[in-house]
């Protein structure tokens, strides 16, 4: 990467990752400069890339195409592996990856360790401690046709010089669509659970792993079968029945359901609170073996190693570690095809989402002979099934407004099951795409997915239109923003996307910005998620159009199986409540919010239709079974941040004594103070309650548990055997609300780079924000920086620099909302801390170091951080100004450049010495 080249992962959803339609690419000669510039990250253009012969290109054109496609693949990897929110279909992603691989094969200078083709999985988030894997955790190469699979099979036979007449033992197993996990056991005890991360370093998620019931805390079986040390590789996933149960619970709680089991498993495994993970019913199957050590004193002896995959699985079974039942031993290519055909027909019948079939050479010695590339073993391959296509009805086309104001049409589909999940909505990108596909509302349409990712609406089934023409209608893009009513228009001439220009106060844009600033890559306010953001910025979302669907006292509609709900008739005189004003009209007030501000915020929820029937259990007793079958179309309001009115709990005798003792101790301490405060109310320093209703003082009900932050809203008169008792009914901030405010307090002291990301500066993502924050040191310095100042920072390109400078220039305009936000945040203590300086010795001060190739002890990012933390400059390209080049495995053209310029080249061991001492 050149000094000022834009980092691919710094583009936001309005740039590289945005999915746009064909821009007239067919008019240009394939491989030409115009053709490359016209390419867009759409499925259609991905197909073009897949069919394109890269060997006809010049080296210069190939480099341009590589950079463009690599940026899209980088964005896809970030979205899939880090955000758990894929933006492209598997088919499109795989086509782009194959294009990169062909380019790198045809033009070796493009092949470098930083290429997405060498990346194992995705980089990890910063929520958990980074830990090095004892042995590298590889990914798998994919093939998408029987021909490609046969080529791999033949290459294995050829590389092993295997006799044609001799069967080669292999194993076949289903490829689980979950998250890779490395379990580390020492002397039979689970020591750590690590995510794959980049293959060298993963996240320590041990606490969450311990909550997964199928993972044993201690290895079982005879003592002589338990090694001193072992790494067990496998997959964490969610079974279909557990996934459906979780989504029902999500919807019943008013939370958005997960799109598919992989996303559900990922979100569950990365919870900061292990108690949440424990409720998610995750499962685990082992599928590989890492480092294995029996130890010198072990009965088996140090040389008694596992010989093949089958023996490893036998050991796992003895230890109580689950292995997928969907595996077979095979000895011929035809048996592999039989396995693929069987699960292709029965992929919907197994207990989890299926992502393909994995084929492995069974013998571990032969595996070592075959070796591996920089990212994947040569002794294994994953066959991916082709995309599934199904037909369904296009019920409607609505529009949604994104964070950058882009207005996107969304297809509302009759729910249909495809490739592992139920699909009810999918993006159509823009109005031109709708016209290009030729779809009409009411059409029968084709929907497809490759794996469990975002679906694509392919087009209409034209034969189904016959005789239904009067039921079809054309979609027309709106002229005005559906969220704020502003006039819509393209951002610049020639744009096919239309945008809402009301950046400051459009509720939809504001909601998306709040979601973004609270995300892990910014302030990391976990309990300020999508639903909370909507409640703060647009609480009237989903407000009924009329009283006909307003049912304030109906939270669910119970029906017998197969029955329809009774028609709803609103009571006479019922009126819709007055519309609420949002608590936040822009981001500036976020850090000034108090719990009291949120007390009356209510959001709209749809009453669920629940089927109820009785069944007889194994014990002969009857029990009621409830099943959520959909929405009723009836709406009611619920508190968004505070609890519903709840009778206070009566204290036990023991609790009353403990309270009295605590109050006496406080009173004694105050009385003995050197300077007692003369007060008539609460003692000095005591936090007053958020407010109580007149006449309802908490002190009037000493026998009840009324928390300090609670409000007594009424008093119920409860009749008991001893007479009438007054019971206070309270509301208080919910647990999630209290956690949200705690996290917001921590965010006031967030790292400077996180503040920059939270400001939603166009094109500025976390990596470049880190570079700028580290180089400039303070928000004040960044505010006053010029484009030249920023482009002088290695890794900051002119487009990003201009965007940052323009953003801060706008803050100085009178009345500008960005300036108001910045000043309000600074007044609340946000962004006033200077960037932390490293406490490590500055052994590399003034030195420029380039790292190329794969290092065993460092990921790409951790190597750069190690250099920067010691005062050095981690450059992306080799020049005369470079002091050292660290050479890892599979180093590319940078090594040749260093040799040409006579720059010292270091091994990983020498790199460690350089970090420690500054010399070699």
From Swiss-Prot:
Annotated NAD(+) binding sites: 90-94, 139-140, 173, 196, 235, 360, 384
InterPro entries (alphabetical): BRCT_dom, BRCT_dom_sf, DisA/LigA_HHH, DNA_ligase, DNA_ligase_AS, DNA_ligase_CS, DNAligase_adenylation, DNAligase_N
One of the record's GO molecular function terms: DNA ligase (NAD+) activity
Catalytic reaction annotation: NAD(+) + (deoxyribonucleotide)n-3'-hydroxyl + 5'-phospho-(deoxyribonucleotide)m = (deoxyribonucleotide)n+m + AMP + beta-nicotinamide D-nucleotide
Record-level GO BP terms: DNA repair; DNA replication
UniProt cross-references to SMART domains, sorted A to Z: BRCT (SM00292), LIGANc (SM00532)
Sequence ranges of Polar residues compositional bias: 669-682
Cofactor(s) recorded in Swiss-Prot or TrEMBL: Mg(2+); Mn(2+)
Catalytic residues in the record: 175 (n6-amp-lysine intermediate)
Positions annotated to bind Zn(2+): 481, 484, 500, 506
Keyword terms of this UniProt record: DNA damage, DNA repair, DNA replication, Ligase, Magnesium, Manganese, Metal-binding, NAD, Zinc
EC number(s) reported in the record: 6.5.1.2
Region Disordered, residue ranges: 662-691
Gene Ontology CC terms: cytosol
Residues in BRCT domain copies: 839-920
Family recorded in the similarity comment: Belongs to the NAD-dependent DNA ligase family. LigA subfamily.
Function, in words: DNA ligase that catalyzes the formation of phosphodiester linkages between 5'-phosphoryl and 3'-hydroxyl groups in double-stranded DNA using NAD as a coenzyme and as the energy source for the reaction. It is essential for DNA replication and repair of damaged DNA.
Protein name, per record: DNA ligase
Species assigned in the record: Bifidobacterium longum (strain DJO10A)
């Amino acid at each position: 990467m050149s000094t000022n080249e834009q980092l691919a992962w710094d583009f936001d959803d309005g740039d590289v990752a945005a999915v746009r339609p064909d821009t007239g690419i067919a008019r240009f000669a394939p491989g030409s400069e115009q053709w490359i510039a016209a390419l867009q990250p759409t499925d259609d253009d991905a197909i073009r890339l897949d069919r394109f012969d890269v060997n006809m290109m010049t080296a210069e054109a190939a480099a341009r195409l590589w950079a463009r496609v690599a940026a899209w693949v980088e964005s896809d990897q970030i979205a899939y592996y880090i955000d758990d929110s894929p933006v492209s279909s598997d088919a499109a992603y795989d086509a782009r990856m194959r294009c990169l691989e062909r380019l790198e094969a045809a033009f070796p200078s493009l092949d470098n360790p930083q290429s997405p083709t060498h990346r194992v999985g995705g980089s990890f988030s910063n929520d958990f401690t980074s830990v090095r894997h004892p042995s590298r955790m590889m990914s798998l190469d994919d093939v998408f046709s029987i021909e490609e699979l046969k080529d791999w099979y033949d290459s294995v036979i050829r590389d092993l010089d295997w006799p044609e007449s001799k069967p080669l033992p292999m194993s076949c197993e289903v490829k689980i669509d979950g998250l890779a996990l490395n379990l580390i056991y020492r002397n039979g005890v689970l020591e750590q659970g690590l995510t794959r991360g980049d293959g060298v370093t993963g996240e320590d998620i041990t606490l969450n792993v311990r909550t997964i019931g199928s993972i044993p805390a201690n290895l079982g079986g005879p003592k002589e079968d338990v090694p001193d040390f072992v790494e067990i590789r496998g997959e964490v996933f969610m079974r279909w029945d557990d996934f459906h149960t979780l989504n029902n619970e999500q919807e019943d709680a008013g939370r958005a359901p997960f799109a598919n089991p992989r996303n559900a498993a990922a979100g569950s495994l990365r919870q900061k609170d292990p108690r949440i993970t424990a409720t998610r019913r995750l499962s685990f199957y082992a599928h590989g073996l890492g480092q294995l050590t029996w130890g010198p004193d072990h009965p088996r002896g140090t040389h008694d190693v596992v010989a093949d995959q089958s023996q490893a699985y036998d050991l796992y079974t003895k230890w109580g570690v689950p292995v997928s039942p969907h595996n077979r031993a095979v000895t011929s290519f035809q048996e592999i095809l039989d396995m693929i055909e069987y699960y292709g027909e029965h992929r919907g019948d197994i207990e989890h989402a299926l992502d393909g079939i994995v084929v492995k050479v069974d013998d571990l010695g032969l595996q070592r002979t075959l070796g591996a590339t920089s990212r994947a073993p040569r002794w294994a391959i994953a066959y991916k099934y082709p995309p599934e296509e199904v037909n369904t009805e296009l019920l409607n086309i609505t529009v949604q407004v994104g964070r950058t104001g882009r207005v996107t049409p969304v297809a509302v589909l009759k729910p249909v099951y495809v490739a592992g999940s139920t699909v009810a909505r999918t993006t159509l990108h823009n109005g031109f795409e709708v016209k290009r596909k030729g779809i009409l509302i009411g059409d029968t349409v084709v929907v497809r997915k490759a794996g469990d990712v975002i679906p694509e609406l392919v087009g209409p089934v034209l034969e189904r239109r016959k005789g239904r023409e009067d039921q079809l209608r054309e979609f027309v893009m709106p002229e005005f923003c559906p969220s704020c009513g502003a006039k819509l228009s393209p951002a610049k001439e020639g744009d096919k996307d239309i945008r809402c220009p009301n950046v400051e106060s459009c509720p939809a844009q504001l909601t998306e910005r709040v979601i973004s600033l609270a995300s892990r890559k910014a302030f990391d306010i976990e309990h300020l998620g999508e639903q909370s953001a909507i409640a703060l910025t647009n609480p009237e979302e989903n407000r009924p159009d009329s009283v006909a669907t307003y049912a304030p006292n109906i939270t669910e509609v119970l029906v017998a199986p197969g029955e329809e709900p009774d028609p709803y008739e609103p009571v006479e005189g019922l009126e819709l409540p007055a519309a609420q004003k949002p608590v936040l009209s822009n981001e500036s007030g976020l850090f000034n919010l108090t719990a009291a501000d949120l007390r009356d915020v209510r959001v709209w929820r749809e009453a669920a239709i629940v089927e109820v029937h009785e069944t007889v259990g194994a014990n002969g007793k009857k029990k009621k079974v409830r099943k959520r079958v959909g929405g009723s179309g009836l709406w009611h309001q619920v508190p968004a941040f505070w609890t519903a009115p709840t009778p206070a709990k009566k204290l036990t005798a023991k609790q009353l004594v403990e309270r009295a003792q605590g109050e006496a101790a406080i009173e004694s301490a105050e009385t003995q103070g050197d300077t007692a405060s003369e007060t008539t109310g609460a003692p000095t320093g005591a936090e007053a309650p958020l407010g109580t209703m007149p006449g309802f003082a908490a002190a009037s009900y000493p026998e009840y548990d009324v928390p300090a932050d609670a409000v007594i809203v009424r008093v119920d008169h409860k009749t008991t055997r001893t007479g009438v008792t007054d019971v206070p009914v309270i509301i208080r901030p919910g647990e999630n609300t209290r956690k949200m405010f705690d996290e917001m307090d921590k965010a006031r002291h967030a790292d400077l780079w996180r503040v920059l990301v939270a400001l939603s500066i166009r094109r500025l993502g976390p990596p470049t924000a880190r570079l700028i924050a580290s180089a400039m040191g303070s928000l004040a310095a960044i505010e006053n920086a010029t484009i030249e100042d920023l482009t002088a920072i290695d890794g900051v390109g002119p487009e990003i620099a201009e965007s940052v400078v323009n953003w801060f220039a706008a803050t100085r305009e009178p009345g500008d909302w960005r300036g108001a936000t910045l000043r309000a945040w600074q007044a609340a203590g946000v962004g006033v801390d200077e960037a932390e300086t490293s406490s490590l010795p500055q052994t590399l001060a003034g030195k420029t170091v380039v790292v190329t190739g794969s290092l065993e002890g460092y990921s790409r990012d951790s190597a750069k951080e190690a250099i920067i933390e010691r005062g050095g400059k981690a450059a992306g390209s080799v020049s005369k100004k470079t002091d050292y080049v660290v050479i890892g495995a599979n180093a590319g053209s940078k090594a040749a450049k260093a040799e040409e310029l006579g720059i010292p080249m270091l091994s990983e061991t020498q790199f460690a010495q350089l970090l420690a001492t500054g010399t070699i």
